[in-house]
Amino acid sequence: MLMPQNPQIYVDADACPVKPEILKVAERHGLEVTFVANSGLRPSRDPMVKNVIVSAGFDAADDWIAERAAENDIVITADVPLAGRCVAKGALVTGPTGRVFDPSNIGMATAMRDLGAHLRETGESKGYNAAFSPRDRSAFLETLDRFCRRVKK
């Protein structure tokens, strides 16, 4: 009989504004973290932290995470298509602002992303994103802590 693996935290690390917060919460809960990026990451001596540099190919980091994420893992990404792939596998998914992606809302999130892309392509929208705020950081910390408690049960 196969033993279930320990829950992992996978981070879509390119341009992720909450890396230090992820490390603190993961350490508090004793969970392993894997940062995945197309470019350099700051090395860590912590054996619970892995850095994976993938090729510069389109969606290479997303593909790496989606292939490995499993039920009861935590995925941190702002990328809606990656979130959808991981939700479909049973992972708990949050964005760096604390936005939760789950089966009840991933369809709408995908539709809104596609609509926004269409509006930008047609010039109807400039596509500005709001600046990352202290409120976003706080919401993220709450969500990640809740997810960590859930996967440890």
From Swiss-Prot:
HAMAP family: UPF0178 (MF_00489)
Record-stated family: Belongs to the UPF0178 family.
Organism: Agrobacterium fabrum (strain C58 / ATCC 33970) (Agrobacterium tumefaciens (strain C58))
Protein name (Swiss-Prot/TrEMBL): UPF0178 protein Atu1478
Disulfide cross-links: none
Classification via InterPro entries: UPF0178
